[in-house]
Amino acid sequence: MPLTSPSAIQPQRRLVAVVVFEGVSPFHLSVPCVVFGEGLEPYNPFEIMVCSVDPAPVRTSAGFALTGLRSLRALQKAEVVIVPSWRDINERPPEVLLRALRAAHARGAIIVGLCLGSHV
C-alpha cells in the first residue's frame, strides 16, 4: 500500500486562461492550446481555460462557434493569461477586458500577447 496518494505526489496544475473574442482565428487559438495542452503526458502541469468577454457562443473567423467558454472572472485565478490575437490593431478592446487584464497583472499573473494580441 502506498504511503502517499497520487495527488500528493503531483503538484497543483497551473491555470492558463486564453482569451477569445468574436472572429478569433482558430489557428491563433490553437497555438496556446497545443503549447500548454499536448505532449505533456503522463502529467500535464497546466489546466487551460478558454475565456471570453461574453461567455455566449463566440463565432470564429472560420465560421464555427466556440461554446462552453468561461467568463473573464476566470482570469482572477489564472497564473498565465494569453491574448492570442486581436481583430484589428485600431480597435480598442472592451474596457471590461482591459480591466480584467490589469487586475490579473496587478496580482502577479503573467500576461502574454501573441501577434496582434500583444497590442491589447
Language-model features: where?
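Gly/Ala-rich beta-loop-alpha elbow adjacent to hydrolase catalytic centers
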Residues: 113, 117
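Extended, subdomain-level signal for the structured scaffold at the beginning of enzyme domains
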Residues: 1-111
